[in-house]
Structure formats: structure tokens, C-alpha cells
Amino acid sequence: MATVDRWLLPDGIEEVLPPEAARIEVARRQVLDLFQSWGYEFVVTPHIEYLESLLTGAGQDLDLRTFKVIDPQSGRQMGFRADITPQVARIDAHTLRREGPSRLCYAGSVLHAQPRALSSSRSPIQLGAELYGDASPSSDVEVISLMLAMLQLADVPDVHMDLGHVGIYRGLARAAGLSGEVEQQLFDALQRKAIDEVIALTEGVPADLAGMLRALVNLCGGREVLVAARERLANAPAPVLAALDDVLAIAEQLSARFPQLPLYFDLGELRGYHYHTGVVFAVFVPGVGQAIAQGGRYDDIGADFGRARPATGFSTDLKTLVTLGRAEVELPSGGIWMPDSTDAALWQQVCQLRSEGQRVVQALPGQPLAAAREADCDRQLILQNGLWQVSPLAS
């Protein structure tokens, strides 16, 4: 094996060095403190699980992103987590089994066999929050507000948010009686805004429903889209109209809370269609080709764990958040150099300094004082009149 092969990392797998690792850790603590202040409880999920459990309730895309191995003890197939959200849903549905609303949050590394997008990380640090047990738009507003508060805390500039609802397309597709195959083909065409394909796929659909399905291609833009949708979808089935009401109610509350937030509506955007059941949302910033935070409602996931519960939440990549954010992360700087000594009084003094939050670095045998600078120390402990004193590091 060539020397270069010993340190070469796989594509999309990164190591994080100081001081960037310290910035990420400080940001993680700050965000989790923010979540806690909103009533969200922190949970830790396993890095690896049996595949049947890990992929329960998840879509095919998660299966493709999951690294798989064989457990040498049981012989069963296992997977490294590629998404923490289903694990947290299991905790709520199967482990906690609370009757009322439950608020949970998490932060941890995930591993992707396939990157989400070109040049994206395959080892992001997923961070998110989930609210279970309430089906009202108020829950969606809460988690979206928390997501935006997180972005404000990180001082991510120029954010804008996309808002949609998978129930609009799903309600129209079911009313039209589309087969699973045609529904999937139409879904793909809508994502590409391929109007000719949409028209062709809806040829055999009753005229009113065909017109509404085709209208989804162009129902994207600012607040005027909701007005146009009310007109174009006026004769839609009741679930579709209820979904429109939810989008409008959520948009109004968000605009009241975040008046400077640009809102963009795309009623044909079906991000997470096979996973989400209601409102879907994503945050974008200029110059980044994919969402930096996203989420939505996924009410059906708990059923696979024996207990269906309404659910809504969001997630982001902590490393991306730190990279894009302008918030100043205060890192400890400087330190105190402790000489190589077995003096008991010195040790007691060092313990006291560390208990006060001071950073103390011990010299190892043979290390010169010049090594203190490399250890980012600006002070030293010296013995004066029988007492160990902290003094500026000699130049």
C-alpha cells in the first residue's frame, strides 16, 4: 500500500480540525440550548441498528443512502443511520408512548452511502427537532419558527423559505383515480415543471381534475399564488381545500412573526412526497444550490412502530450551518503553561485554576518554554517566594 493511500479519505468524508471543530461544538451547544428553551428534550439514537428497524417507515431513497453491514454476532443485516428522524419517531411511538404532545431534539453524525447532491458531504452532522401528538397548523408554525430562530442564532444571511403541501397533489391524484405508476410519473414531471409531460399524463383524467393537476406546474411564486390557487382549485376535493387553508394559515402566522422573511410558494413542489403527509418547507440562501434546512409533516411514520401519531419537524447539517453563519463563536484563547514538576502545591494550584475555567497545559519532560507558544499559552506558572503565581509568558 502506498503511503498516500493510508491518509486518503473517501469522497464526501471529511475530518474536522481545530479550531473549526471547536466552533462546531460551541454552535451545537448553543442550538441545543435554544431547543431546550422551547421545551424540546434531547435524545441520543444508535449509530447502527438492524436494518428492519432502521428503515421502517422510510422511503426507498433512505434505503439507497444507508451503508449496510452484517452483524458478526447475529448474522443479521445492519445499517449505519443515514437519517435520525425515523429513529426519533420510533422513540416517541414505541419507547416513550406519551399521550400528549412530545417535543424531542437531536444532534449527531450520519453516514450516507450516496451523497444527497453533487459534492455534498456524506458525513453530515444532522441536527433537528420534532413535535409529536398534534395535527394542527400551530405545530407546523412552531417548528418552522424554531428553525428560523436557529438560523437567526447562527446569523445566516439572506434566507428565504419555500412552502408547499403534498396533500394538494395527493388529493387531486386520488380523486383522479391515478394508478401508482402514473401517479409516480406525474410526480416526476411536476418536479421538472415538464408541462408537456403533465398534459400527456392527464389525458384520460376528467377535464376539471386534469385542469387542476396541470395548474400545479405554474402555481409557484409569492403570496399571489395562494389567491390564484383558490381560483384554479375552487372545485377541488375537500382535502385539497383544507390543505390550501393550512398553507394560508401557516403563511399568515409566519409573516406576522418574521415580517422580513421572503416566502415563496410552490404547490407543485413535492419534496419528500413519499415520506411527508402535509406541509413541507425548506430554507435556501443565495449561492447554495440545495436547501440548508428543511422539514415538514409526516403523520404516518409512527404507525410502522405500532402507534400512529401526528408529527412535524425539521433538520439541518450543523457543519453547513456553521459555515454559512456569520455569528461570532467565542473560542477560549490563551492558556497557562504548567512546568514539569511533581510539587504538590503546584498541582493544587492547577486544579484550582482549572475549576475556575482556566486552560492549563502541562509541560512534558524535556519540553522547552518555547513549546508554550505552540500550545497557545500566554501565561505561565512560576514559583515566587514559595508560592506558585500566574505570570505573563516571557517573550
Curated annotation (Swiss-Prot):
Compartments, record wording: Cytoplasm
Listed pathway(s): Amino-acid biosynthesis; L-histidine biosynthesis; L-histidine from 5-phospho-alpha-D-ribose 1-diphosphate: step 1/9
Major subcellular location class: cytoplasm
InterPro entries (alphabetical): aa-tRNA-synth_II/BPL/LPL (IPR045864), HisRS-like_core (IPR041715), HisRS/HisZ (IPR004516), HisZ (IPR004517)
Keywords, comma-separated and alphabetical: Amino-acid biosynthesis, Cytoplasm, Histidine biosynthesis
GO biological process: L-histidine biosynthetic process
Gene Ontology CC, one term: cytoplasm
Pfam families in the cross-refs: tRNA-synt_His
Organism domain of life: Bacteria
CDD domains according to UniProt: HisRS-like_core (cd00773)
General remark: This function is generally fulfilled by the C-terminal part of HisG, which is missing in some bacteria such as this one.
Function: Required for the first step of histidine biosynthesis. May allow the feedback regulation of ATP phosphoribosyltransferase activity by histidine.
Family: Belongs to the class-II aminoacyl-tRNA synthetase family. HisZ subfamily.
Assembly and oligomerization: Heteromultimer composed of HisG and HisZ subunits.
Record protein name field: ATP phosphoribosyltransferase regulatory subunit
Native species: Pseudomonas fluorescens (strain SBW25)
Taxonomic path: Bacteria, Pseudomonadati, Pseudomonadota, Gammaproteobacteria, Pseudomonadales
